């Protein structure tokens, strides 16, 4: 573990699903010594990459990994069922990439908070490029890896109702990578669950799932780092 992350006393983390969905918390023994960054940008045009790779749930975020296939957290997908809807890269009430029905949910069998969701290819409500899901979105590619000190960005829909589904991008440094865990100093909020964690080349490093509840300069965020095993699971469950 990175020397800037010190195991000390109990600090509460929050699973970052909007209060409009679930209000779950978990406990972790972590205290940070580095100051968190608060570099957050509102995205004005969601019809360009990498923003075309992001989707919105009612209370959380997801992102595209292949044909008709998106990724989010287990704690998000457990509140959805076949027939429920997602919206591709909405930009408040200005535009979106179409609205699509969920057709299958597949949870990662390990402890990691990862869930694959397949959607119907034909939109309920069309996007700017027609009714086909794959014409309106852009799948992300994987990064070769990540290490402490690398710059990352988290793109998602914090407080989606309050912010009227405006997409936000938050940036900061990686604090540590250990096994399937990645810790980073980027500002995230409720609703960011399921957001992609990207490197400076907009390549996938992991998926965001939680951050410290405390709102101060030592606040860190937490994601699932994409190990070869997790990448294999995702690849095996992408729509053919």
UniProtKB/Swiss-Prot annotation:
Pfam families: Trypsin. One of its GO terms (cellular component) is extracellular region. Disulfide bonds: none annotated. It is found in: Secreted. It is an enzyme of class 3 (hydrolase). Keywords: Hydrolase, Protease, Secreted, Serine protease, Signal. GO terms for molecular function: serine-type endopeptidase activity. Residues 1-36 form the signal peptide. The active site is at 75 (charge relay system), 113 (charge relay system), 193 (charge relay system). GO terms for biological process: proteolysis. Its EC number is 3.4.21.-. Belongs to the peptidase S1B family. Serine protease that cleaves specifically after the sequence Trp-Glu-Leu-Gln. This is Serine protease SplB. It comes from Staphylococcus aureus (strain bovine RF122 / ET3-1).
């Amino acid at each position: 573990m990175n020397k800037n992350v010190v195991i000390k006393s109990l600090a509460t983390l929050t699973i970052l699903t909007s209060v409009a969905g679930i209000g779950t918390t978990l406990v972790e023994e972590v205290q940070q010594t580095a100051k968190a960054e608060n570099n957050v940008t509102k995205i004005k045009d969601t019809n360009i990459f990498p923003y075309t790779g992001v989707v919105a749930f009612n209370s959380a975020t997801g992102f595209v990994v292949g044909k008709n296939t998106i990724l989010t957290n287990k704690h998000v997908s457990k509140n959805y069922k076949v027939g429920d809807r997602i919206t591709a890269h909405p930009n408040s009430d200005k535009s979106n990439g179409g609205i699509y029905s969920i057709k299958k949910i597949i949870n990662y069998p390990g402890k990691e908070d990862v869930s694959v969701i397949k959607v119907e290819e034909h939109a309920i409500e069309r996007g700017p490029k027609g009714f086909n899901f794959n014409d309106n979105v852009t799948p992300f590619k994987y990064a070769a890896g990540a290490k402490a000190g690398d710059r990352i960005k988290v793109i998602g829909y914090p407080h989606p109702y309050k912010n009227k589904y405006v997409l936000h991008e938050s940036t900061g440094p990686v604090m540590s990578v250990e096994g399937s865990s990645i810790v980073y100093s980027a500002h995230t909020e409720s609703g960011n669950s399921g957001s992609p964690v990207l490197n400076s080349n907009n390549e996938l490093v992991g998926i965001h799932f939680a951050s410290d509840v405390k709102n101060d300069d030592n606040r860190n965020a937490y994601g699932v780092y994409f190990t070869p095993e997790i990448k294999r699971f995702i690849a095996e469950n992408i729509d053919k």
